[in-house]
């Protein structure tokens, strides 16, 4: 069991199943079980995934001043997250609408409200940092002070870059330069994947880079073992909704990497973990325990054969 501090964006999500992306205009569409509303966002999804895997998690985020925190722990879910460090200090909780179709294409509409103006109370964070094994951050403004805490306490820092864009790269340099592990999603990157990973590795010198590629799998770079490898996605369930798959993959990778220091084994486990996740509606559903994941692994593969 590892101890994580996870800080970043949490939002309320409305997920809508549509016939195809891009959508065609129709004045009315009625379809049963096609709209799902829940809590989501990088920090929430990653915290929940790590908790399912058996880790200790300090979940740190900001929400609207009138938000009902019970939305983070619905009664029918076995695993709960502490909301002790969920601070209601912004006017409204960020919102997202996600449209998706059967081909795994998706279209997002995001409204981060006034989260860019939030200031997290770091006095709550400081006593917890020495006890954690890793800090996991979103590249949002209120997470910037967390970087120095990780560096000063010699803690591993993992950062999921939310919607990477070249014209915004300069604003993310403090995250990029200090992270031991970086995660990008290719849905906002219009560059040759291997060249992008190579450039990020040379420019920022992280230990690990993961480039999530959706239905095409992932590319992983490991500085210490000197390789850059593509892994295909794993298909174990019918795809219901691929939203949150990147969060699931990232969290599971971090869980196993801290445990084993083996990036190949960790990405292998993470791809399997994500494949189960996308068989469920909602970004925060479909997670497995470590025991369940190992059982799936033994049924599907010989783990040594994946290295």
Q: Where are the predicted features?
A:
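Ribokinase/PfkB-type carbohydrate-kinase core domain
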Residues: 2-12, 75-87, 99-229, 261, ...
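Residues at secondary-structure transition points
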Residues: 34-41, 92, 240, 244, ...
């Amino acid at each position: 069991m590892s101890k994580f501090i996870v800080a970043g964006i949490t939002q309320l999500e409305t997920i809508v199943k549509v016939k195809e992306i891009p959508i065609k205009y129709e004045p009315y569409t009625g379809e049963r079980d096609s709209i799902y509303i829940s809590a989501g966002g990088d920090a929430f999804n990653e915290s929940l995934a790590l908790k399912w895997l058996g880790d200790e998690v300090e979940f740190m985020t900001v929400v609207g001043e009138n938000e009902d925190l019970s939305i983070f722990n619905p009664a029918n879910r076995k695993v709960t997250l502490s909301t002790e460090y969920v601070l209601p200090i912004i006017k409204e909780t960020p919102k997202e609408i996600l449209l998706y179709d059967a081909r795994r294409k998706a279209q997002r509409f995001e409204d981060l409200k006034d989260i860019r103006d939030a200031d997290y109370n770091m006095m709550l964070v400081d006593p917890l940092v020495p006890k954690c094994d890793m800090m996991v951050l979103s590249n949002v403004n209120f997470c910037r002070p967390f970087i120095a805490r990780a560096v000063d306490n010699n803690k591993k820092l993992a950062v999921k870059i939310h919607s990477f864009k070249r014209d915004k790269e300069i604003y993310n340099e403090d995250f990029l330069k200090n992270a031991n592990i970086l995660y990008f999603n290719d849905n906002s990157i219009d560059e040759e994947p291997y060249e992008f990973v190579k450039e990020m590795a040379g420019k920022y010198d992280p230990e690990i880079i993961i480039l999530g590629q959706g239905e095409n799998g992932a590319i992983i770079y490991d500085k210490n073992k000197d390789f850059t490898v593509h892994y295909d996605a794993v298909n174990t369930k019918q795809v219901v909704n691929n939203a949150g798959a990147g969060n699931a993959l990232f969290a599971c990778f971090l869980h196993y990497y801290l445990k084993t220091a083996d990036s190949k084994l960790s990405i292998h486990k993470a791809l399997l973990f994500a494949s189960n996740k996308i068989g469920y509606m909602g970004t925060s559903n479909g997670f497995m325990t470590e025991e369940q994941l190992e059982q799936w692994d033994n049924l599907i593969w010989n783990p040594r054969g994946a290295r």
